[in-house]
């Protein structure tokens, strides 16, 4: 790869020199050539001129393309002598089906290229137009291949996204052009995304396309946040039934206007299938959240699928390996994987919109048992200082100590009204124990945002439907099960190491006031109780973790799921996807 990049660097210097020369010869007598006897030198000169007019893109694809042409004496890539359009036709055929990936063909100049191609077939193009065709086809070819392999949008442009992903480089460009020369059809077929998650979403998109032309009457929003109770009548019930019949949750009934006047159990069952699919609260009432989800057009659901197809095209720079943890912030869940199979699943609490959980990739390297909590400055300034103005007992009740320059001080001696963003000299530390906000276990991983996974002393928060309530860290529902997942998976024959791991697990259990369960743990507790206390455990190996954001995905049961765009990231990505256009 280093040699390829150095080669491209040298070529770019030569190409720049060539492109800076005058092109008066190209501009003279630019007429329709004799297609049986094309002047190769004139065509190459026209291509050189056309490349000099090409705009540089921030992602460097343009300069890579220029360098490829320059390193091959500006020979045409797609215009074959004698004229043969098979390769361009092949590429256009793939681009005509780009809708399965969430884009429109003309975003890649499909109509412009098609017109130029037809003129080529009719031998109507001048040398300069032949050059335009050749370079434009190269540009859309690279954009198409790069988009499918790495994504059409670089996620790094989004403030919330902090994961490193693979990017186009000179090696990829060389691979594309070499494939174009020898096995284009095979290469275009192989570069299509083939993961199970991607193909499953594409299949579901096909299903939703079947619903696009279906007409249903929008359901009126309920006034004053009222709800429709099970067993009651309401004018919207037939409309709700009709909408569920279209998408298949409720069997079709041509007499629905008279069959569904009351919110009955049959409708409830269908409605809860829909609510499960869209991440809504499952209950025996119909509220405005459900009505709003029912009122979304099928085109809007398709758009959500398209946005998440793009997310699936983003390939992490570092492989997650066979054992890893994935937090889907939008779904507010954590799944732990072994060999791409979910081994452990749980609810989590994530950051509210103004304190969003950062999307990143890292590795859990350490477990902290009975952690203390150093309160972030933002919480001191925006929350605790305001409470402390009125309630000095807050600190004692919540086991929080206050320090100034390393010395513990009495919080009642502080004038909390003077705490501002420019004046906050105090360090607040909450004692470890069952009352600690981090609970009994913390999972540390490197990141610049000081976020981590942790247990919680407020278990009720994990029973909420909307769990986007934290200051950015992730509260986990099953901390002890997650601890067990973090231990190495060893075969039973490794008796000694398994016994050591069982003992370590029991030390953690004992340290958080749970009973030990292994034979080794019971013996150690009896012979040396002090040895059973542990406050930190460094993991070996580290466990990869990815904080992700998927608002549409296929669950382990193979069912499509939609989730609220809690951080408004779908809309930002959709704007970028709609703006794609190859000039």
What are these regions (language model features)?
Residues 1-31:
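Bacterial Sec-dependent N-terminal signal peptides
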Residues 26-169:
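Cationic-aromatic interfacial patches
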